[in-house]
Curated annotation (Swiss-Prot):
Propeptide: 471-487
Organism: Trypanosoma brucei rhodesiense
One Gene Ontology cellular component: plasma membrane
Cross-referenced SUPFAM superfamilies: Variant surface glycoprotein MITAT 1.2, VSG 221, C-terminal domain (SSF118251)
Glycosylation site positions: N71, N84, N418, N465
Stated role: VSG forms a coat on the surface of the parasite. The trypanosome evades the immune response of the host by expressing a series of antigenically distinct VSGs from an estimated 1000 VSG genes.
Keywords, in A-Z order: Cell membrane, Glycoprotein, GPI-anchor, Lipoprotein, Membrane, Signal, Trypanosomiasis
Location of this chain's protein in the cell: Cell membrane
Membrane disposition: Lipid-anchor; GPI-anchor
Alphabetized InterPro entries for the sequence: Trypano_VSG_B_N_dom, VSG_C_dom_sf
Protein's name in the database: Variant surface glycoprotein WRATAT B
Lipidation (GPI-anchor amidated serine): S470
Main subcellular location: membrane
């Protein structure tokens, strides 16, 4: 749409026009497209396809696994309150713990895939897994908690950003509007308080809002003729007529007229950075397209068809002098850009910057959601590892070789029964109630395999299986970096 409009605008730019029907048609169509786009507020959707649900499910899985694999204190009473638990009000603690138990009980109701009768997660306390596995569970849960907090912050920032965008759109459309509420746009009372010229030329009225400028190109100071609106559109509709703009009430009553026409004739585009750029480009190309030999700067800073004089936008005739002049705004200071001089364009640029910020927020939101899902996969692996730890530790304990004494040494030591001193001096093991009453035996001979550490004592640098099968991929547990998750 914008490309076609720009081509039509460029094709008709810098040509001499006389008064007549639709003489401001290009300008009107451009304003209609802008007005429709801003009024519709078709801002990019906050939600991304399926990611919200998947991220929420990922957090539920992470939180559930961490709970059933936590130490007894966390499992029984939940995480510490915001305040230091040592200073926690003892009257408040029972209520907090009760809520935690209620929440924890929901985990038991999560059914195993394909078997609704069995719970998905079983309790696996820390003393039944290796210390390395417990440390990895802690790390993943910390990373996931940080991602979840950042997601909540981003959601708040996105909501605030949307209100700020709506505010700028409202200010562009109508002076004094733009608080994020549904807008009833009207031209500016102050600009039209005296007469047409105060709003449509000079340095105070032009460019304050789209409503002001739209009235300027489609109405006159004195005429009530149907041809007044026909300067902008060929639609003949008694409800679309303008009356004289001497009075504020008439000015405000007239403004909805072109909006009804815009709704019939112009498309409604999505509000994007690209479309804002396109509408500014189209406006720049359209500015000054009606050349007038006697007009100020030959009408270079006039929007619409004005009179061929130095007072081109006086609105004094039904079909000849309806335009808005930005001359005083643009030339007031050397080097002033259009966006710097024309207030409504400045507001569009602010809205565009906020749309860019919104796009970056949405991208960050998607990254955090993807991160949560990756962490959920890792947490599931660690849950399987915790189950494997218990089986492996039990198996190692069962297979540990029994220590047996050397038979020759045993015979030699038996000579020192009831002789504590001699027993010890000959490297034997004494067990007795008195120095002269007791047994002397050979010390046990250790097995050929190294002793196995107990639960929670495994070397933090050992290799841990992540899935519980003998041929599965293994990772080093110390140091635990998870570098691929720290983005």
């Amino acid at each position: 749409m914008w490309i076609i409009l720009a081509l039509l605008t460029l094709a008709g730019s810098r040509v001499a026009h006389g008064a007549g029907k639709n003489v401001n048609g290009v300008e009107f169509n451009l304003f209609c497209h802008i007005a429709n786009m801003l009024n519709a507020e078709k801002i990019e959707d906050d939600k991304t396809d399926g990611l919200d649900r998947q991220a929420a499910e990922a957090w539920t899985a992470i939180d559930s696994i961490f709970t059933v694999t936590a130490n007894e204190s966390y499992y029984s009473e939940g995480p510490a309150s915001a305040a230091n638990t040592t200073d926690e009000n003892q009257d408040a603690k029972p209520e907090r713990v009760a809520k935690w138990v209620q929440k924890r009980n929901q985990i038991d109701k999560i059914a195993a895939p394909g078997n609704e009768k069995n719970g998905k997660y079983a309790r696996r306390p820390r003393d039944r897994m290796s210390a390395a596995t417990g440390a990895k569970l802690d790390t993943v849960f910390t990373l996931a908690s940080e991602a979840r907090v950042r997601l909540m912050q981003i959601d708040t920032e996105i909501a605030t950003n949307k209100q700020e965008i709506r505010q700028q759109l409202g200010l562009h459309c109508s002076e004094g509007q733009g608080k994020g509420q549904s807008r009833n746009q009207h031209p500016d009372n102050a600009a039209f308080a005296s007469d047409y010229s105060t709003a449509c030329k000079g340095s105070t009225g032009p460019g304050k809002s789209l409503a002001n400028d739209l009235v300027c190109i489609c109405s006159t100071d004195t005429s009530q003729a149907q041809s007044t609106l026909q300067m902008c559109t060929s639609i003949d509709d008694a409800n679309s007529l303008f009356s004289t703009l001497h009075k504020r009430s008439q000015c405000q009553g007239d403004f909805p007229c072109p909006h009804r026409v815009c709704a019939k004739t112009a498309e409604t585009s999505e509000l994007t950075e690209t479309n804002i750029n396109n509408c500014v480009t189209a406006f720049t190309a359209t500015l000054g397209r009606h050349t007038k030999s006697s007009a100020t700067n030959e009408g270079a800073y006039v929007f619409g068809s004005g009179q061929n004089s130095g007072d081109e936008c006086n609105g004094g005739a039904a079909t000849g002098q309806s335009c808005v002049s930005y001359h005083d705004l643009i030339t007031a200071k050397s080097g002033t850009t259009l966006s710097g001089a024309i207030t409504r364009l400045k507001q569009l640029q602010i809205a565009k910057a906020k749309l860019k910020a919104r796009r970056l927020l949405l991208q960050n939101r998607e990254r955090q959601q993807t991160r949560l899902m990756a962490l959920a996969d890792k947490m599931q692996e660690l849950y399987q590892e915790a189950l494997h730890d218990e089986v492996q530790l039990r198996k190692e304990a069962q297979n540990k070789p029994q220590e047996t004494p050397d038979s020759d040494k045993q015979k030699a030591c038996e000579k020192y029964h009831n002789k504590s001193k001699e027993c010890k001096e000959n490297g034997c093991q004494w067990s007795g109630t008195e120095e002269t009453i007791g047994k002397c035996e050979a010390k046990p001979k250790a097995g050929t395999e190294a002793a196995t550490t107990g639960p929670g004592e495994r070397d933090a640098g050992a290799t841990a299986n992540t899935t519980g099968s003998s041929n599965s991929f293994v990772i080093k547990t110390s140091p635990l970096l998870f570098a691929f998750l720290l983005f």
